[in-house]
């Protein structure tokens, strides 16, 4: 996929996130798993992000493939994530997947919840 084509996607899946998913799937020995990102009500800012591994792609789900692994987003969550990026970081504060969301008007200190 070209950089221009990747920029046109509703949500981006970084190399760091895809690489970590690939490593985790190899450890689990289950290539059918996909990283699902979703938005639910809650958290200190109104909405919160969630991540889980899922074997299914449901009707209407949006998928992005990178490095042979898939990111899956349900249509309801996608409307809050358009233009965003799913990334992965590892540092002194620990390791985690996170969302860079240009639609968030406020976020909490830990970055796990947001409002629009």
From Swiss-Prot:
Keyword annotations: Iron, Iron-sulfur, Metal-binding
One Pfam assignment: Fe-S_biosyn
Residues of the signal peptide: none
Single biological process term from Gene Ontology: iron-sulfur cluster assembly
Chain coiled-coil ranges: none
Keyword set includes Zinc-finger: no
Database matches in InterPro entries: FeS_biogenesis, FeS_cluster_insertion, FeS_cluster_insertion_CS, FeS_cluster_insertion_RrpA, HesB-like_dom_sf
Subunit structure: Homodimer.
NCBIfam families (UniProt xref): iron-sulfur cluster assembly accessory protein, PRK13623.1
Protein name as catalogued: Iron-sulfur cluster insertion protein ErpA
């Amino acid at each position: 996929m070209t950089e221009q084509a990747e920029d046109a996607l509703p949500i981006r899946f970084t190399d760091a996130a895809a690489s970590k998913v690939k490593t985790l799937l190899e450890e689990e020995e289950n290539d059918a798993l996909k990283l699902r990102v979703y938005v639910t009500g809650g958290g200190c800012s109104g909405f919160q992000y969630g991540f889980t591994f899922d074997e299914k792609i449901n009707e209407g789900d949006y998928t992005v493939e990178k490095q042979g692994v898939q990111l899956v987003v349900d249509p309801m969550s996608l409307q809050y994530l358009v233009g965003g990026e799913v990334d992965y970081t590892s540092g002194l504060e620990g390791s985690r997947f996170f969302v860079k969301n240009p639609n968030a008007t406020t976020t909490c200190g830990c970055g796990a919840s947001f409002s629009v």
